[in-house]
Amino acid sequence: MAKVLYITAHPFNELVSNSMAAGKAFIETYQQQHPDDEVKHIDLFETYIPVIDKDVLTGWGKMSNGETLTDDEQMKVSRLSDILEEFLSADKYVFVTPMWNLSFPPVVKAYIDAISIAGKTFKYSAEGPQGLLTDKKVLHIQSRGGYYTEGPAADFEMGDRYLRTIMTFLGVPSYETIIIEGHNAEPHKTEEIKATSINNAEKLATTF
């Protein structure tokens, strides 16, 4: 039995968002095809994720030295630890994001910062950093209004590229994508684009 974290980063649901519609189709099909697997939904817009600030950095330093943390430091450090441990407990991750300003919503970066921890998801060695998530799988579903997979705007895309890079850095050997794009560039194709993405999501769910 595998554990899947379904990690969404959109303020709207599948009735408004193409990425959320594809994500919903994926998860529903996945659960039908893998009834024994556990799926947990993490809505990053409804989840408290402390940013790495002065309290967190000071708290980590105090922990290393065996010193007492303030209440704020302890609260933030403990919450980040809980997020990390939940992430480590899973076998597969499904990220659902929109493209915002060539990347993704800031809550995704906050989440990535929470799970990118030396000694837990990667380690330092004489040969350089080494990823520790060598038995995990990732799927990224992202919706973009324009075309960024290829063409003149391809070099501007930094959301999926960053997520793929950080997951590779953390050692993840399997990274797949469902990219939904062009519905703003060609509004007359909106329904066709959405239907294709849902179909692709349902197909991938059977083998993921």
Curated annotation (Swiss-Prot):
Top-rank lineage group of the source organism: Bacteria
InterPro entries: Flavodoxin_fold, Flavoprotein-like_sf, FMN-dep_NADH:Q_OxRdtase_AzoR1, NADH:quinone_OxRdtase_FMN_depd
Residues given in the record as FMN binding sites: S17, N18, S19, M99, W100, N101, L102, S143, R144, G145, G146
Subunit-level organization: Homodimer.
Family according to the record: Belongs to the azoreductase type 1 family.
Cofactor: FMN
Classification via PANTHER family: FMN-DEPENDENT NADH-AZOREDUCTASE 1, FMN-DEPENDENT NADH:QUINONE OXIDOREDUCTASE
Name of the encoding gene: azoR
Cofactor binding mode and count: Binds 1 FMN per subunit.
Gene3D superfamilies found in the cross-reference section: 3.40.50.360
Catalytic activity from the UniProt record: 2 a quinone + NADH + H(+) = 2 a 1,4-benzosemiquinone + NAD(+); N,N-dimethyl-1,4-phenylenediamine + anthranilate + 2 NAD(+) = 2-(4-dimethylaminophenyl)diazenylbenzoate + 2 NADH + 2 H(+)
SUPFAM superfamilies: Flavoproteins
EC number: 1.6.5.-, 1.7.1.17
NCBIfam families: PRK13556.1
N-terminal signal peptide: none
Cited function: Quinone reductase that provides resistance to thiol-specific stress caused by electrophilic quinones.
Protein name in UniProt: FMN-dependent NADH:quinone oxidoreductase
Pfam families on file: Flavodoxin_2
One Gene Ontology MF term: oxidoreductase activity, acting on NAD(P)H as acceptor
Keywords: Flavoprotein, FMN, NAD, Oxidoreductase
Top EC class of this enzyme: oxidoreductase
